[in-house]
C-alpha cells in the first residue's frame, strides 16, 4: 500500500515546523506551562496550520494525543445545529489525561456562518476548562470579532522557498532518490509557498518514474516557462497568429485549460524582466481574463482577447 508522503513526513514536534519561529516559540512556552489558550491559526493553504496543531497536541499529550485531539472540518459542519449539538457534546466531555483538557481543532473555521460562530463563542466560554479550541482559517477577517478576541491569533505565512527545498531534499534522501537543480526549482516554483502541495507534487512525479521540470509542469497543470516566454514575446511584438498558435498547442496538445494558462502567465510575469509599466498592465489584463473565464466565458475567446491586449501593450512605448 502506498503511503501518503504528506502524512508520512508530517512534523512530529514543534521544532520540525519550518519558517514560523515566532509562532513556534509562543507555542513552546504554552507547552512548558502545560496550559494553552484558545488559538486561531490564520494563513493560506499549505502553510502548516494543521501540522502545527498536531505537533502541539503531540508535545502536550505524547503518545495519547489522538485520544485527546478531535479534528473537525467546518466546511462539512457549518450549520448552527452542529454547533449546538455535535460540538457541544464533544466539548462538554472531560478527558482523563493529567492536563484536564483536550483540543478541538476546527479546520476551515471561516466557512462557518456568522450565526454558527456566535453559537460557538458561547460553547467556548462554557466548556473552556475541558476543551481548548484551535481554529484554522484562510481569512481571519471572516471570523467574528467575539471569537478573535477570545483567542491568541497566529498568522502563518507562505513557506519560504529554502524551507520547501530543504524538506523535499530530506524526503528524497529518505526515499532513496535525488532531485536535480532544475527540477527542484520547478517544484519550488509551482508550490508557491504551499508545503503540502510541494510534497504531493514530488510524490506524484516520483511515482511516475520521471523527475523532470517537464513532468512537474505537466502534473500540476502549468505551461512550461519556455512556452509561456515565447507566447508573451510573440504577443508583445504584435505577432498575434504565432502567439495564438502557441496557445492552441497548450490547449489541445498539453491539455491545459484557459485558467491553467492564465495562471501560468501570471506566475511567469511576476518574476520576469518585463518593464514595471508593462508588468502592471499585463497583470491587470490577466486578472480580467481570469475573472471572465471563471464567470463562464469561452476560454478560447478570452485567450484571443488576452493576446490582443498584450499586443496593444507592446505597441506602446514606455
From Swiss-Prot:
Residues that, per the record, bind ATP: 43-50
Top-level taxon: Archaea
Matching Pfam families, A to Z?
Answer: AAA, RCF1-5-like_lid, Rep_fac_C
Sorted alphabetically, which CDD domains does this protein's record hold? AAA, HLD_clamp_RFC
A GO term from the CC aspect:
DNA replication factor C complex
Q: Where is the signal peptide?
A: none
Q: Which GO terms fall under biological process for this protein?
A: DNA repair; DNA-templated DNA replication
Name the keywords, alphabetized: ATP-binding, DNA replication, Nucleotide-binding
Q: Name one GO molecular function term.
A: DNA clamp loader activity
Which proteins does it associate with, and in what oligomeric form? Answer: Heteromultimer composed of small subunits (RfcS) and large subunits (RfcL).
Name the family.
Answer: Belongs to the activator 1 small subunits family. RfcS subfamily.
Function description: Part of the RFC clamp loader complex which loads the PCNA sliding clamp onto DNA.
Tell me what this protein is called: Replication factor C small subunit
Write down the species: Thermoplasma acidophilum (strain ATCC 25905 / DSM 1728 / JCM 9062 / NBRC 15155 / AMRC-C165)
Amino acid at each position: 500500500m502506498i503511503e501518503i508522503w504528506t502524512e508520512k513526513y508530517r512534523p512530529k514536534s514543534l521544532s520540525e515546523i519550518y519558517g514560523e519561529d515566532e509562532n513556534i516559540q509562543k507555542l513552546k512556552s504554552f507547552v512548558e506551562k502545560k496550559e494553552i489558550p484558545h488559538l486561531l491559526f490564520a494563513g493560506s493553504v499549505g502553510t502548516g496550520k494543521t501540522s502545527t496543531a498536531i505537533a502541539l497536541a503531540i508535545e502536550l499529550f505524547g503518545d495519547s494525543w489522538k485520544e485527546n485531539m478531535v479534528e473537525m472540518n467546518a466546511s462539512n459542519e457549518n450549520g448552527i445545529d452542529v454547533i449546538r449539538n455535535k460540538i457541544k457534546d464533544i466539548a462538554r466531555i472531560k478527558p482523563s489525561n493529567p492536563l484536564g483538557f483536550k483540543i478541538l481543532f476546527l479546520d476551515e473555521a471561516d466557512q462557518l456562518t456568522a450565526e454558527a460562530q456566535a453559537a460557538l463563542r458561547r460553547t467556548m466560554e462554557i466548556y473552556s476548562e475541558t476543551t481548548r479550541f484551535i481554529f484554522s482559517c484562510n481569512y481571519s477577517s471572516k471570523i467574528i470579532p467575539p471569537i478573535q478576541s477570545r483567542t491568541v491569533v497566529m498568522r502563518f505565512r507562505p513557506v519560504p522557498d529554502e524551507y520547501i527545498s530543504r524538506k523535499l531534499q530530506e524526503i528524497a534522501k529518505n526515499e532513496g532518490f535525488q532531485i536535480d537543480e532544475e527540477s527542484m526549482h520547478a517544484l519550488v516554483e509551482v508550490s508557491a509557498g504551499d508545503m503540502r502541495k510541494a510534497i504531493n507534487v514530488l510524490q506524484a512525479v516520483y511515482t511516475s518514474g520521471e523527475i523532470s521540470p517537464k513532468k512537474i509542469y505537466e502534473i500540476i497543470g502549468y505551461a512550461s516557462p519556455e512556452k509561456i516566454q515565447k507566447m508573451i514575446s510573440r504577443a508583445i511584438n504584435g505577432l498575434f497568429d504565432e502567439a495564438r498558435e502557441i496557445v492552441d498547442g497548450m490547449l489541445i496538445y498539453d491539455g491545459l485549460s484557459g485558467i491553467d494558462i492564465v495562471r501560468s502567465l501570471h506566475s511567469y510575469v511576476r518574476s520576469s524582466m518585463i518593464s514595471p509599466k508593462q508588468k502592471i498592465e499585463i497583470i491587470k489584463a490577466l486578472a480580467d481574463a481570469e475573472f471572465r473565464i471563471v464567470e463562464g466565458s469561452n476560454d478560447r475567446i478570452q485567450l484571443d482577447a488576452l493576446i490582443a491586449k498584450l499586443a496593444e501593450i507592446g505597441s506602446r512605448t514606455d
